[in-house]
Each structure stands twice: as C-alpha cells, then as structure tokens.
C-alpha cells in the first residue's frame, strides 16, 4: 500500500509547488501600491480606470456608466416613465438634485473615482512612446468625465460661463486631500480642451492593435470629444473641423452593417 501512497504524495507536492505558476497571472488593469509610479504600468492604470467606469456598481440598477446613460434617457424624455422600467427618480431630476439619493452618490463617486484613477496614470513620469500614448488615453478619459460633469451639474456654457460648476482635480487624492471648491463652467471646459489637445499630440502615432483595444481612445475619439466640446461652447466652425477629423478613415455604413455593429466587435 505504501508504494502507492508515496508517489501520490510526491505528485501532490509537485502540483502544489507549480500551481502558482499557472494561477498567478499578471493583471492588466491594476497595479500594487508599490508599482504605481512605474512608467510601464501607465497602461494598466488606464485600463483599470476604464473598467471602473463601466463595471463599478452599488445596486442592480446602478452598474457603471451605462446606468448614467439610462438616467439621461429618462431626464431627456427619450423614454416614457413607467414603474416597470424604473429610473423614475431620474425623470423627476432627483438623481442629480437630492444628495442622499442612491444614484446621486453613485454617479458622483463613479465619475470622480475614474478621474482620480486617470490622475494617477497622468502623474507618472516616463519617456517612452508607449508611456505617452497611455498618458494620452488617460487624458482623453479624464476630459470625457469632466465633459459629463459640466453637462449634468450646471446650465450650458452659452447661458453663463462664469456660473459655479464642479470641482477640478488634476492630481491623485488621498484621505488627507482637502476638498476643492467649485470651478466655473468656463474653467471646467478649459480643462477639457487642455486635456484633449494634449491627448491628441500624445496619440498622433497610436494605432489600436486589434478588436480587443477598441475601447482605447485614439485621435478619432479625441476629435469626436473635441467636436462635442466645441458645440457645447458655441464654437461652430471648430466643431465642424473636429467632426470631419473624427470621421477620417471611416465611411457611412449600410443599414445591414449598422445592425451588425451591435453584435460583432469586428464591425467598423
């Protein structure tokens, strides 16, 4: 009996010793605290910021940025308010006006946590082209977040650019960070433009490597965000130029191809 037990035990010990090699995978969307400042980790920090924006949730009805898009549909009267659909508090604008509403705090945390993650990536010092491309993507995502905040927490730029809007954070925060006061609408949009223009210069040579990277901003995405920001600030000619630049390399899809885009990630 012993001659069978000993080889079996030896096999278990060997399996236990090498299992870590198979299971300890290098994460692609997070880094440990002692690796945050490593330039090579900027891309992983951006990935983590992106995934947080779409995966963080507090309830079944508050999961990622898609929940905020559903909220916007209701606030803009794009859908009918029905009990079975939910988001009735959004229809009443309570989700941006009442501080203790669950979606109010969820939205605030989701966007500012994403900004903070981007700030962590942007704060790293590096000199490689890959590093600056990851930094450019973090800048584009931060601009997207501030663009969202500007549209949700104050009237339009054209109504009053000096109106108080939201706080601007450009550096990583800690538990000891002193909360900042609200910046004006003009200051928030200036932050958006500064980030997007810098992102554009960092991403000028960036090319996505396959369908798995379609979530990563490139110059087309940056120009699309610039077009939106120019529209919101009444700069019509600049908006048109940015929109033309955003669609470079793409043609209008057929109706069939458009429908396929919802089911096929390879569809352009």
Where on the chain are the PLM-derived regions?
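Short coil/linker segments at helix-helix boundaries
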Residues: 152-186, 190
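Hydrophobic-face positions in mid-chain alpha helices that act as interaction patches
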Residues: 44, 57-60, 64, 75, ...
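Structural signature of alpha-solenoid helical repeat junctions
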Residues: 130-134, 141, 188, 211-214, ...
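Sec-dependent bacterial lipoprotein signal peptides
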Residues: 1-16
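Inward-facing hydrophobic residues that define packing positions of alpha-helical scaffold repeats
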Residues: 115-118, 189, 196, 243
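Conserved, well-structured interaction surfaces
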Residues: 83-153, 183, 201-204
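Membrane-proximal, proline-rich intrinsically disordered regions
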Residues: 18-68
């Amino acid at each position: 009996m012993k001659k069978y037990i000993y080889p079996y035990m030896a096999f278990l010990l060997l399996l236990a010793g090498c299992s870590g090699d198979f299971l300890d995978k290098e994460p692609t969307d997070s880094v440990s605290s002692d690796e945050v400042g490593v330039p090579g980790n900027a891309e992983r920090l951006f990935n983590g910021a992106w995934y947080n924006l779409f995966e963080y949730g507090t309830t079944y009805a508050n999961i990622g940025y898609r929940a905020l898009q559903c909220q916007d549909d209701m606030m803009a009267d794009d859908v009918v308010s029905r009990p079975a659909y939910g988001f009735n508090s959004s229809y009443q604008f309570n989700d941006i006006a009442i501080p203790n509403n669950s979606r109010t705090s969820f939205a605030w945390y989701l966007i500012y946590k994403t900004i903070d993650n981007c700030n962590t990536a942007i704060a790293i010092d590096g000199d490689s082209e890959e590093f600056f491309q990851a930094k450019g993507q973090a800048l584009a995502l931060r601009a997207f977040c501030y663009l969202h905040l500007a549209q949700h927490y104050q009237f339009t730029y054209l109504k009053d650019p000096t109106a108080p809007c939201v706080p601007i954070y450009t550096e990583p925060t800690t538990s000891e960070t002193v909360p900042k006061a609200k910046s004006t609408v003009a200051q928030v949009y200036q932050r958006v433009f500064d980030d997007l223009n810098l992102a554009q210069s960092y991403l000028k040579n960036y090319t996505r490597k396959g369908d798995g990277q379609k979530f990563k901003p490139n110059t087309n995405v940056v120009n699309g965000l610039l077009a939106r920001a120019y529209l919101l600030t009444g700069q019509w000619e600049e908006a048109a130029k940015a929109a033309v630049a955003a669609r470079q390399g793409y043609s209008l899809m057929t109706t069939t191809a458009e429908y396929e885009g919802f089911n096929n990630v390879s569809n352009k």
